[in-house]
Amino acid sequence: MNIKIYAVNLTPDEKGYNEVHETSCSHAKSIRNFELLGCFTDEIKAVENAKARGYNADGCYYCCRNAHKG
């Protein structure tokens, strides 16, 4: 089982989504305003957790492709 740490960007992107990233994602390195979501076995669970916290969450195209809707 491969567990990774995820965070959600608190600043929505141009489409209104709060992107969820693995903390090791190179596209997350520039994010200064984020909330750690915790450890999950897959990105879908991380995005579901962010949505349960009230975010309009979507997975990062690069590190959370299975949870990326657009």
Label the predicted regions.
Residues 1-2:
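Absolute protein N-terminus
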Residues 38-39:
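A structural signal for short, well-ordered beta-strand elements
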Residues 45-50:
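Well-ordered alpha/beta subsegment
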